[in-house]
UniProtKB/Swiss-Prot annotation:
Family annotation (InterPro entries): Ribosomal_bS21, Ribosomal_bS21_CS, Ribosomal_bS21_sf
Full protein name: Small ribosomal subunit protein bS21
Record keyword Ribonucleoprotein present: yes
Domain of life: Bacteria
């Protein structure tokens, strides 16, 4: 759990913004959203595999674009 110390004479909205940023860095909201509903193991594997394919396609696309620019 991210903890922030409110500084002296610090406005509330600034402290809240720092807290939100620390929560975002810790990945709390993403974790809560992922665990909000039960996901069957087969669905989780399917989603992970699709994400891996998408990452690979993105990487290959970037490499091909780099090669084209070099010539």
């Amino acid at each position: 759990m991210p903890i922030i110390k409110v500084r002296e004479n610090e406005p509330f909205d600034v402290a809240l913004r720092r807290f939100k940023r620390s929560c975002e860095k810790a990945g709390i909201l993403a974790d809560v959203r992922a665990r909000e509903f039960y996901e069957k193991p087969t669905t989780a594997r399917k989603r992970a595999k699709a994400a891996a394919i998408k990452r690979l396609a993105k990487k290959l696309s970037r490499e091909n674009a780099r090669r084209v620019r070099l010539y």
